[in-house]
Amino acid sequence: MCKKTHRIIDFRPQANWYWLFDHNRAILTLNMGDRVIDIVYKPEMLILKFDQPVFFTIEDVANYMDLFEGPALGDYWPALRSQIILHALVANQFHKPIMPKNWLFESSVGEQPRVHKGDHIILKSSAIKEAKKYFVLDNDENFILCMLIEKSHGLTFNRNFVQFQIVKVTYDKIFATKADCNTLSQYV
C-alpha cells in the first residue's frame, strides 16, 4: 500500500528563483527550485536579452509580495494568485509594448468607469459576445493594460485569448468593474 504524502507549497519568493528562457521549448520559464512555471507569452512578444538565469530582484520580491498579500487577488487560490503575479511581473519586465486592440471588444453604454492598477474588469468580445474577467496591470488617461484571468476568452469563432494573455484597450470597452465581476451572467 502506497502512502500519500501531502506537501504544502510555499508561494513566497525565494532567493533561488530565477527566469530562464528554455531554448528547446522556446518558452520563458521561472525556476522556483522544486518546480518550473511556464510563462504563456510567445518569445516574439518578449524582450529577451539573456541566455543566463535572471534572478528575482528585491523589486520583484516586493512587487510579488504586495500583490500576493494584498486585497486585489485575495479571492484566488494561492497557486492561481502566484501565476497571475508571475505573468504580471513578466508583462512589466520582459513584454514588448503592445498596441490597443479595441476592435476585438464591444463598447459599453453609459459612463466610462475609471479603473486603477489591481482592479478587475469585464471585457466582452465584439464578434461572439463572450464576457470574461481581466486584471488591470496598468492604466493611463486613455488606455488600460489588462490580463485575462479566466482560462480562455473567445474573441471570434477562430480566435481565443489564453489565460494570462495581456491586451490594451480604451476605457469605453469596460463592461463592469470589480464590484460587478461576481455577476458575469448579466453581461453575456
Swiss-Prot record:
An individual GO BP term: FtsZ-dependent cytokinesis
One cellular-component annotation, GO: cytoplasm
UniProt keyword annotations, A-Z: Cell cycle, Cell division, Cytoplasm, Septation
The UniProt record lists the keyword Cytoplasm: yes
Location within or outside the cell: Cytoplasm
Purpose: Contributes to the efficiency of the cell division process by stabilizing the polymeric form of the cell division protein FtsZ. Acts by promoting interactions between FtsZ protofilaments and suppressing the GTPase activity of FtsZ.
Similarity comment: Belongs to the ZapC family.
Protein name, UniProt field: Cell division protein ZapC
